[in-house]
Swiss-Prot record:
Signal sequence, renumbered to the chain: none
SUPFAM superfamilies: Nucleotide-diphospho-sugar transferases
Keywords (A to Z) from UniProt: Lipopolysaccharide biosynthesis, Transferase
GO MF annotation terms: fucosyltransferase activity
Pfam families: Glycos_transf_2 (PF00535)
One biological process term in Gene Ontology: slime layer polysaccharide biosynthetic process
Pathway: Slime biogenesis; slime polysaccharide biosynthesis
Organism (species): Escherichia coli (strain K12)
Name of the protein in question: Putative colanic acid biosynthesis glycosyl transferase WcaE
Length: 248
């Protein structure tokens, strides 16, 4: 089974180097096969040259050209993917050191489910919090797992892809569309990835809440009262996360 690892980057050579290094332990496992797809937004910081010098290690394929933002870049990665499942590890995100044990289990899974695992959220200064994957019904409030810990069936990604209408929650919208189309969530035990906090979902919580509410109403068709309750719960959670990030 081939796993597609898709990395989106823009002017973050340090992050690309970090993500690349985390793939090494997977490559050492004989029964794991993967490709690394990097979509760079035309950076001028040496990212392209670094990738060229890797000479295709880890079945690397990449493009370096302007795009219309992170979700447009992710769609480019989907178009290039040839695996059964795909995981999005953007520049600076890394596989957990024990992720090989999790990845091995994928070859026994059917490609009509979204596989979820746990992730470590890095707030800096050694402060990390584990986010455990939740049951599939949690999609009616939010993603059941961190985006960096969801293995999407590539066949499903090629049908739906990321909707650029959703500025900060297109990952939630995509998972919701696939869920409504019959792709269930299946939780497997184990840590998949680690990633640093401080992205759009951490710093722009008001836009995140509004975007997520639109997903709930337009895609998941949840009742208005539930969408309102979810909005308040999300706002409280994201505010706490933002405060913790700023404190650390």
């Amino acid at each position: 089974m081939l796993l597609s690892i898709i990395t989106v980057a823009f002017r973050n050579l340090e992050g690309i180097v970090k993500t690349h290094a985390s793939l090494a332990h997977l490559a050492q496992v004989e029964d794991i096969s993967f490709e690394w797809i990097v979509v760079d937004g035309g950076s001028n910081d040496g990212t392209r040259e670094y990738l060229e010098n890797l000479n295709g290690i880890f079945n690397l394929r990449f493009v370096s050209e302007p795009d219309n933002g992170i979700y447009d870049a992710m769609n480019k990665g989907i178009a290039m993917a040839q695996g059964k499942f795909a995981l999005f590890l953007n520049s600076g995100d890394i596989f957990h050191q024990n992720a090989a044990n999790f990845v091995r289990k994928l070859k026994m899974q059917k490609d009509n489910v979204m596989i979820t695992g746990d992730a470590l959220l890095d707030f800096g200064d050694g402060h990390k919090i584990k986010r455990s994957a939740k049951p599939g019904w949690y999609i009616y409030h939010s993603l059941p797992a961190s985006h960096q810990a969801i293995f999407f069936p590539v066949s499903g990604l090629k049908k739906w892809r990321y909707d650029l209408e959703y500025k900060v929650s297109s990952d939630y919208a995509l998972a919701a569309k696939m869920y409504k189309a019959g792709y269930a969530f299946k939780k497997l035990n184990g840590l998949v990835s680690e990633f640093s906090m401080g992205g759009v979902s951490t710093t722009n919580n008001m836009e995140l809440c509004a975007d997520a509410k639109k997903v709930q109403r337009q895609i998941l068709h949840v009742p208005g009262f539930w969408a309102e309750l979810s909005w308040h719960l999300r706002q409280r959670t994201t505010s706490k996360t933002k405060a913790l990030y700023n404190k650390v």
